[in-house]
Design a protein with these regions (language model features):
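Bacterial N-terminal signal peptides
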Residues: 2-15
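Extracytoplasmic small-molecule ligand-binding "clamshell" domains
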Residues: 21-97, 101, 161, 241, ...
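Short, Asp-centered acidic motifs that coordinate Mg2+ and/or phosphate
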Residues: 30, 84, 88-89, 178-179, ...
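Periplasmic-binding protein-like
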Residues: 35, 111-118, 192-232, 252-260
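Bilobed "Venus flytrap"/periplasmic-binding protein-like clamshell domains
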Residues: 35-38, 47-62, 94, 115-164, ...
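Extended ligand-binding regions for polar small-molecule ligands
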Residues: 51-63, 122, 129-130, 134-135, ...
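Acidic, polar ligand-binding/catalytic clefts
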Residues: 58, 62, 67-130, 196-211
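Ligand-binding clefts/hinges and TM-proximal coupling segments of bilobed small-molecule sensing domains
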Residues: 67, 143-162, 198-202, 233-260
C-alpha cells in the first residue's frame, strides 16, 4: 500500500512539473525569412533586415513582449526545417491549399496579387495557349512555380526556375526569358519602377488559383496551435491600435480592414 501511495505521489509530482513547463511564458519567436525579396524582406547596406514582413514580425513580437530572432533561409518553403524546430514560424507565405496540407497558418497579414509581366510589345497574356513555347521565369519552390508547372507546363509553356529574383529579372531584361509570373509589389520594386523596367508592364488580368493564394500569412507547425493563437491575437491588437495600418501604408497594398 505504501508503494502504491509513493507511485501516486511521483505521478502527481511529474504531472505537476509537466504542467508547469507547459505554462511557461514564451520569451522568443524565431522567424524564418528568405532575405532577398524586397520590399518584403531584404538586407540594407548595413546588413540589417528591412521590409514589410520584418516590420510586421517585430511589431507582433513587441505586442507579445517576446524577443524576435530572424533565421535566414535560401527559400521560404523550408518545411523540413520548421518541423525539425530549427525555427518557430515562417514569416510571409501565401497559405495555398497545397501548403495547408503540411503546415498551419495564422490569419491573413495582407492581400497579394499575381500578374504576368513581359515586354509591352510582346502581346502576351496569362493564357497557356498564348504562352505555348514561351519561356516564363518563376522562383524556386514558390507558389508561382507550383502553379506554372501544374497549369502551364503541360500545355507547352517552358518554365524556368530561379533561386534569386535578381537573377530572374536580369534574364527577363536580357531576353533569356520572355515573361515572369510575380507578385505585383515585388516586381514593381525589382523591375517596373526602375529604369530597366520602362519597356515592361503587367500583361492581361491578375492570375487567380488555389495554388497561388491571394494573401500572405505566417506558417507554423500544425501542432503549434498556441503560437498560432498568440500571433492571431497580437495581429488583432495591432489592427485595433492602428499600428498595422501605419506599417502597411508605405507599401502600396490594399489594407485589410481593422477588426471590430
Amino acid at each position: 500500500m505504501a508503494l502504491i501511495h509513493l507511485c501516486a505521489v511521483l505521478v502527481f509530482s511529474l504531472s505537476s512539473t509537466a504542467v508547469a513547463v507547459d505554462v511557461q511564458p514564451r520569451r522568443e519567436i524565431r522567424f524564418a525569412v528568405a532575405a532577398h525579396f524586397p520590399p518584403f524582406q531584404s538586407r540594407n547596406s548595413q546588413g540589417q533586415l528591412v521590409g514589410l514582413n520584418i516590420e510586421l514580425g517585430n511589431a507582433l513580437c513587441e505586442q507579445l513582449n517576446v524577443r524576435c530572432t530572424w533565421v535566414d533561409q535560401v527559400v521560404m518553403e523550408n518545411f523540413p526545417a520548421l518541423e525539425a524546430r530549427q525555427f518557430d514560424a515562417i514569416m510571409g507565405m501565401a497559405p495555398t491549399c497545397r501548403r495547408r496540407k503540411r503546415v498551419s497558418f495564422t490569419d491573413d497579414l495582407y492581400p497579394i496579387t499575381t500578374r504576368l509581366v513581359a515586354r509591352k510589345t510582346s502581346g502576351l497574356r496569362p493564357d497557356r495557349r498564348l504562352l505555348k513555347g514561351k519561356r516564363v521565369g518563376v522562383l524556386v519552390r514558390s507558389n508561382r512555380e507550383a502553379y506554372a508547372l501544374s497549369q502551364w507546363a503541360p500545355a507547352g509553356v517552358i518554365i524556368r526556375s530561379f533561386w534569386l529574383n535578381d537573377q530572374l529579372v536580369q534574364s527577363l531584361v536580357s531576353g533569356d526569358i520572355d515573361a515572369t509570373l510575380q507578385g505585383v509589389v515585388e516586381i514593381r520594386e525589382a523591375l517596373l519602377d526602375t529604369a530597366d523596367g520602362l519597356d515592361f508592364d503587367f500583361m492581361g488580368p491578375p492570375v487567380s488559383s488555389g495554388l497561388l493564394g491571394n494573401s500572405v500569412a505566417i506558417a507554423v507547425r500544425k501542432t503549434d496551435t498556441a503560437l498560432r493563437n498568440e500571433l492571431n491575437h497580437a495581429l488583432e491588437q495591432l489592427m485595433q491600435n492602428g499600428e498595422y495600418q501605419r506599417i502597411l501604408q508605405p507599401y502600396r497594398l490594399g489594407v485589410l480592414p481593422a477588426r471590430p
